[in-house]
Curated annotation (Swiss-Prot):
Main localization, broad class: cytoplasm
Superkingdom, taxonomy of origin: Bacteria
The family this protein is said to belong to: Belongs to the RbfA family.
Keywords: Cytoplasm, Ribosome biogenesis
GO BP: any one term: maturation of SSU-rRNA
UniProt GO MF annotations: ribosomal small subunit binding
Name this protein carries in UniProt: Ribosome-binding factor A
One Pfam family, short name: RBFA
Record-linked NCBIfam families: rbfA
Classification via InterPro entries: KH_dom-like_a/b (IPR015946), RbfA (IPR000238), RbfA_dom_sf (IPR023799)
Recorded coiled-coil stretches: none
Amino acid sequence: MRRHKSKSIPGRNLRLADQIQKDLAGIIQREIDMTRAGLITLSGVELSADYAHAKVYFTVLGAEPDTAAALLNEKAGWLHSQLYKLLHIHTVPTLRFVHDLQITRGIEMSVLIDRANRPGPHSGVPDEPEDQS
């Protein structure tokens, strides 16, 4: 039985995604005026198999996610050229910025869990007895 060797180096995708995230965070912090877009944190990078495209996930505080996404995607071409100068690879991926909803959903789930665990008249959990001193 013949085995086909993978042409990609194991873990390369993850290492490259981490490096892109690190470099982009530095470029955005140093070079782009993000006062309109609030405080932006890059939370992850997802690369296509051929490294031609990258989804860059971000979270934002102090501004609307759509405003931040529009500003980042407007600067994507310039950010691509800056990455090209830093990364020593043949193909630097085209960048697309996407608001990361995982943190927002996590907070919503935490609130729902706290609400469900809160003692109340319909929860089946008795309220704290009142002190009758």
